[in-house]
Amino acid sequence: MTPPQMVSQLDDARLDERQRAILDRQLHGLGGETKQRKNVFAYATVSDRIVLSVSSICAVLAGALNPLVPVIYGLLVSVYDGFAAGTVSASELRSKTATFSLYYVYLSIGLFAFTYVATVGFYYTGERMARALRTTYLAAILRQNMAFFDLLGPGEITSRIMSDMGTVQEAVTSKLAVMLTAIATFCAAFVVAFIMYWKTALIISPFFVIMIVTETLGGAYMVRHHKRAMELYSQAAGIAEEAIAAIKHVTAFGIQTLLSQRYLSVLEQAAKADRKAENMVAGMIAWMNAMPNLIYALAFWAGSIYLTRGQMSVAEVSATTLAVTIGSFAIIRIAPSAQALLSGIAITGEILKSIARRSPQDPLVKEGDEPSTVVGDIVLDRVGLIYPSRDDVDILQDVSLRCAAMKKTAIVGSSGSGKSSILGLVERFYEPTSGTVLLDGRDIQSLNLRWLRRQIALVDQMPVLFNATILENILYGCSDMVSQWSESEQLDRVVQASKKANAHDFISALPDGYHTHVGEKGLQLSGGQRQRVAIARALIRDPKILLLDEATSALDSKSEAMVQEALDAAAEHRTTIIVAHRLSTIQNADHIIVLDHGKVVEEGTHHALVAQNGAYAALVQKQQIGDTHDHKAPDGARLSIEDDDDEDSRYGGNTEYVDEKDIRTEEVALSSAAHDEGTQRDSLKLSALQTIAFIARLSKRDWKVLLFGLANAILAGLTIPVQSVFFAKILTVIGFPPPQYPQLRSEVDFWSGLYVMLTGTTFLFWMGVEIALSYATQKLARRVREVCFRSILVQDMAFFDVPGNSPSALSSVLSKSTNDLAGLGGPVMGGILTFLSTILAGIVLALAIGWKLALVCTATIPIVVACGWLRLQVLSTFDSKVRQSGIESAAYAGELVRTVRTVASLGLEEHALARYEGILAKQAAKSLRSILLASALYAASASVVYLCAALAFWYGGTLIASHEYSTFQVYICFVSLISGSQIAGSIFTYAPDASKAMHASREIQDIMNLKPSINKVAPTGPPPAHEGTEKNQPQQNLSACRVEFEHVSFTYPSRPTRRALDNLHITVEPGQTLALVGQSGSGKSTCVSLLERFYDPDQGRILIDGQDIKLRDVDEYRRDISLVSQETIIFSGTIRDNITVGLAGQEVSDDEILEACKQANILEFVQSLPDGLSTLVGTGGSMLSGGQKQRIAIARAFLRKPKILLLDEATSALDSQSEAIVQEAMDAIRKDRTTIMVAHRLSTVQNADVICVLQDGKLLEIGTHEQLLGKRGKYWEMVSMQSLH
């Protein structure tokens, strides 16, 4: 999975050969790939190989036992003929029949034993090999350099681990076992045929060669197109996961239909490639089913000639022909298993390519120097940097600077100037294209990467915490040393680090203290709490170098003060490099470096640079807050603020930490809510019939195609009873005495001709089955994916607040669950229907010919069916457990990939892999018992058929001895019913498919049945029915836009014990700007969420021009609103796509787009790119800096020309210069619209018409900037804390 090149290659004239080589190896890995393992079996251990060898031998022996049937059958025919000729007495007939019937019993016992051992062994080793492959793949991913991830499709890793690995595991377990058994049956049958009479076997052998060649060539063609289809399905999975991860912005912009169309477009491309593969498979299956009829025709025709010449006996002709029959049906069974195996091979090839890629920045290798001491002196010497994924832009140009040991160095500058890139170079996330980065005089490229990162601690603007306890998260900072400490020592060290980070007090106040789970992404904690836990995590390793990248920019003033105090303490006695936009945080730095467009423009201390009145002084001036000189803060103003650090939710309940005493209560409430909304997908139990009915309803549009395919399936099933009539008739004919040989030859020619005709009809029937039903199945899978994706995208935010509805889990439903449901689609249903028609027709035929023997044989079929049904139930339970484990492991792997920079920075690769292996091993231990039971039932369903044969022959011989039945009657009953019994057993080879489909249908039905209370049911579906008459009143367009919160109270569904807003009443007049300020957790962003109708108030109303917003059409309402949030979302695609994303379906000229870019202060950057607006931004905007992404989001909002503008920390990621320009543009466009701002940086709100100070969801203060300063209250304290002096 080497990332593709996404941007144009740099002009060769700009780069020398060395620079091109540096970029190339970061994109494509080092030359001379590691020794690549050829297939999944290379991941088997010695014990696995022993078990696999024994299992393979048992599978071969099980397959080889089947052709012994013709031998026993030939002996019985000889006895029957002898009785008819008078050479065998009735008592002798009964005795020999009983003996030969016992042979069938012995055959059944042997087949059961061998099948059981083979099945258990393959399931056991297959699970272990797939587990090893999963682990190795994830290890290979975690080894890769950052450029690899910059171009990696969103959701691709999760899709590989969840869906593709499941296909591989299935291929090397049940499918491989079935295929080996079938191959052994075919080979043994071929040998038996040669032993019986080699000439006849030699005559028909070309047909076997044709069948093998057909499978080989057809399989290669199928793999090629199936591989392309899998690549496209992986791409579609990436689109889905990216959309679900950004669901709030998707909802706000109303782009559900746009993303659904993009998703569907890729699915259609995948379906085209898949259809080519399926058409070839259809031809192969039809040919394999038709070919045996030609073999019958030729075998009987040739056999009759040798019989009349006296070179063969009747027993040899019948035994040879029956052996050929068994061998041909074995080849038919090979095809579907080979298809699954080849699919697994194709997928494994892509996985092995990723595993074989050699990373130029591998954290797990032992190479590189490890100096015994570190001083911490960092020097960049004439460093140039070009990102491999954006090789047309110089990020750093000839930068030389020094970060002195044990000193605090700050780097400031405009957005995109290269500040964070310097930190990336120090961490060795990227390689410089020129110059060197030195640590204590050593080139860091010569140092061991893992050792280097252990000396460094990084604290980001948005710190990543993992879904674990606070204790575990802090210990992740020194994961390599934890094993050396006792539990008490671990806790002591964590407490010490927490005290240094100013985090111990709030952690101790929690009910579970350091053992409190922080939730996914740490969202159970506030922003300030997360930041302080991240600082503690950084300090526990006692790093020599501390990197702080906008560590306080996302915090309110009070949280910033507490975190800044912790950072100041952390910076003591170590080299510290700070990247910051808020200059108040770096005034005390020992050295300040100012960057502009990748170059150093100024250096010095804060006071020296201010005195120069240059670029730095201009930045300082822009961050001053007016009028504070008239209202000085008293001494200790910072300390006067209460330690209330709970953070407001970012459009969701997950980010707001509740009162600590209520945590357990809320967890129970969450579980209950999840159950009530139907999100507990495993709680719904669907039977196989319900699953089939569900699939039928989904396939209603294609009923004509389905009807055609299923009709052909019934006709195809009837060909086997017809074969039994032909077979029994010919066996009777070839028993004629020598005087009747001319008649024998004539009738054999006639029946052989009928076999040839049956070949053509069988081929046509099976082609109709496979082509029609595979087409319908593809349509089913595409429709399910589309409907589920649309359903997910229109759900209310409360749905996504439920922990089980993570992007990875929902993406899994769209990929693996859809595939599993399709596994019980057309071809499988057609196969089952074919087998049922064969069984029923066989029973009817046998009853018509010889009802006594037919009733006895038919009575045994339910036993076979019961064994298969029990196996299905066991597999259903087993698959449920495996599925849950797969979701858990895939979700964890997805979390690691999404947070790979944090994983790399902390050196967590080995720890993460160990935990991942633990998740997989835990499930493997649980599944062993189910494997043992399921294998026993499967072996029983495969071997009981020979007990049926024993009974049939014994009772048939008794009827012949008593002259009640002729040999023809016994032959036709035996062939039709024993074949029917075998086919009844074959139905349950589809048990794994049915089991997976049953579980998948539960998940998919839950998704489809979800009914959002706010959003429309589906973008293209009918609008939801409204209750009452009030909601049916005419819609009004947003015009004057007077916004009023009328006594609004609200509690997040996922946080039912605490009110986010409490009786809030605020009015914003048309055209006014309202600023919402306050501490984290005060309810500011909740107001934005309610205005966007992500949620509806519990009490009160929100009015627009006097009308409740709940009475408006939600899509029309949101079109007149633009949201710019701190959490900037950039979608994969071009800059143009991202700016126009909120105007889906509307014609927008480039001039309009460029004007919006100019307003957002990003025009110069866009025009500097070779591809301009057509430049690809990478996954999640990975090609852009944080400020550039924010300005694109602002340009997007400007272009929508909204009537209501919502700004939630819209400029928090911008440098002072960009912020001033963008703020000026915002001030200009606010004149014609109502604006509601949420801000921590108070310099951005001082010109607002109304400023509301919120606390604990209530309105604390209201007024203008000057009025609130005059009150010397809460707002005055906040302003005083942010002023620069």
From Swiss-Prot:
Q: Which residues cross the membrane?
A: 57-77, 102-122, 176-196, 203-223, 281-301, 312-332, 707-727, 753-773, 831-851, 855-875, 931-951, 968-988
Q: What induces it?
A: Expression is positively regulated by the fumisoquins biosynthesis specific transcription factor fsqA.
Identify the pathway.
Secondary metabolite biosynthesis
Q: Which residues are glycosylated?
A: N467, N1037, N1138
Q: Which Gene3D superfamilies match?
A: ABC transporter type 1, transmembrane domain (1.20.1560.10), P-loop containing nucleotide triphosphate hydrolases (3.40.50.300)
Kindly state one GO CC term assigned in the UniProt record: membrane
Out of the domains of life, which is the source?
Answer: Eukaryota
Which part of the chain is the ABC transmembrane type-1 domain? 54-343, 713-996
Q: Where does ATP bind?
A: 413-420, 1078-1085
Question: Where does this protein chiefly localize?
Answer: membrane
Membrane-topology descriptor: Multi-pass membrane protein
Q: Which GO terms describe its molecular function?
A: ABC-type transporter activity; ATP binding; ATP hydrolysis activity; ATPase-coupled transmembrane transporter activity
Which keywords does UniProt give here?
ATP-binding, Glycoprotein, Membrane, Nucleotide-binding, Repeat, Transmembrane, Transmembrane helix, Transport
Q: Could you provide one GO biological process annotation from this protein's UniProt record?
A: transmembrane transport
InterPro entries in alphabetical order: AAA+_ATPase (IPR003593), ABC1_TM_dom (IPR011527), ABC1_TM_sf (IPR036640), ABC_transporter-like_ATP-bd (IPR003439), ABC_transporter-like_CS (IPR017871), P-loop_NTPase (IPR027417), Type_1_exporter (IPR039421)
**Where is the protein found, in the record's own terms?**
Membrane
Q: Where is the ABC transporter domain?
A: 380-622, 1043-1281
Fetch the PROSITE patterns from UniProt: ABC_TM1F (PS50929), ABC_TRANSPORTER_1 (PS00211), ABC_TRANSPORTER_2 (PS50893)
Where are the residues of the annotated region Disordered? 627-654
Q: What does this protein do?
A: ABC-type transporter; part of the gene cluster that mediates the biosynthesis of the isoquinoline alkaloids fumisoquin A, fumisoquin B and fumisoquin C; as well as small amounts of fumipyrrole as a shunt metabolite. The products of the cluster lead to a brown coloration and are important for growth and conidiation. FsqE possibly plays a role of self-protection.
Similarity comment text for this entry: Belongs to the ABC transporter superfamily. ABCB family. Multidrug resistance exporter (TC 3.A.1.201) subfamily.
Q: What is this protein called?
A: ABC-type transporter fsqE
Q: Source organism lineage? A: Eukaryota, Fungi, Dikarya, Ascomycota, Pezizomycotina
Name of encoding gene: fsqE
